[in-house]
Amino acid sequence: MPYDKVIVPRDGAKITVNADLSLNVPNHPIIPFIEGDGIGVDITPVMIKVVDAAVAKAYQGKKSIVWMEVYCGEKASKIYDGEYMPTETLEILREYVISIKGPLTTPVGGGMRSLNVALRQELDLYVCQRPVRWFEGVPSPVHSPELTDMVIFRENSEDIYAGIEWKAGSDDAKKVIKFLKEEMGVTKIRFSDDCGIGIKPVSKEGSQRLVRKAIQHAIDNDLPSVTLVHKGNIMKFTEGAFKEWGYELAAERFGAELLDGGPWMTMKNPKTGNDIIIKDVIADAFLQQILMRPAEYSVVATLNLNGDYISDALAAEVGGIGIAPGANKGGSIAVYEATHGTAPKYAGQDKVNPGSLILSAEMMLRDMGWIEAADLVIAGIKGAIKNKTVTYDFERLMPDAILLSSSEFGKAIIKHMDA
């Protein structure tokens, strides 16, 4: 179908989705991309060049990606008369199934709190999937970063990120406080006359669809455990319910059984016959254990706020969010993204590390079934880092490293695909 501002390439075809949510990927799929704000202008072109090189090398012209630019954020506001998230963009992201985006800024002033959060909610991208791994040679503040190798499944649609809150002193806040006191008998609001109020929605459906994705990932990748991370010791009916619903889903959907009387459970991987342990950990204890015993964890399922903290804490252990990939996924739609911010003071300087977006594109290639191209991206990144040809964030911490710009780092990755 024709669009108002977006030009659909003549070559290429759409990715389609089967009834079982598997993908039909043509040899020349059209992939929408959002350049992103700030440093998006630097890192997105590098990502495209690296991906194109990997695909060309892997398939010798038999496959290629046909890129289609769509708009969100500051660039969209200029093209769509002030709209930061045009309806047209949302329609395209739904229709073309798989897309990738750079970092987005949040409009200053009232209204939309975060474009990233709004995008997830509008498209019901209820999973934020964040793989965390260390590449040899990357500077790390921990003693054995190679022990950290896990995938975070963060619930994207609920928890306090739903944005249901009222400003202290507002009429709406006063109404909610009055209702809580007079209708619900709440007596624990310490300073109720000048208090902001927020709601933390956590549902059975939202919790279980996330845990189902996490367990399926463990099955598909033959991983030994899924850990439910929560604060159920304090918030029993939200975080605690998440834990209970997770265990319930494991039993009912995957046949998990109690381990040594519970609450931990065990199940057989139906593809390999290996054991998968379903366990839970309190969030604050987990933040200690990822420093002290990271090798004990492989797949993590958690609610929105905990997932935000945990993802970035883990990224710091393996080199920072500059090389931390991520994807937001729903039933059939996936938007891969740079996990860092827009860093506007560096925009246009060809300076920052494009690794986060490149590794997110590697996730995209792997999910498309283009494993050979994905492997080449990994080989290129490994080679560039091992050779100490890196961007400034790594160069300043690596003795005898060679400082590269964003675009030069992309060229180094492509060069090391041949290694």
From Swiss-Prot:
Belongs to the isocitrate and isopropylmalate dehydrogenases family. Keywords: Glyoxylate bypass, Magnesium, Manganese, Metal-binding, NADP, Oxidoreductase, Tricarboxylic acid cycle. Optimum pH is 7.5. Optimum temperature is 55 degrees Celsius. Maintains 90% of its maximum activity after incubation for 10 min at 50 degrees Celsius. Signal peptide: none annotated. This is Isocitrate dehydrogenase [NADP] 1. SUPFAM superfamilies: Isocitrate/Isopropylmalate dehydrogenase-like. It comes from Psychrobacter sp. (strain 13A). The lineage of its organism: Bacteria, Pseudomonadati, Pseudomonadota, Gammaproteobacteria, Moraxellales. Homodimer.
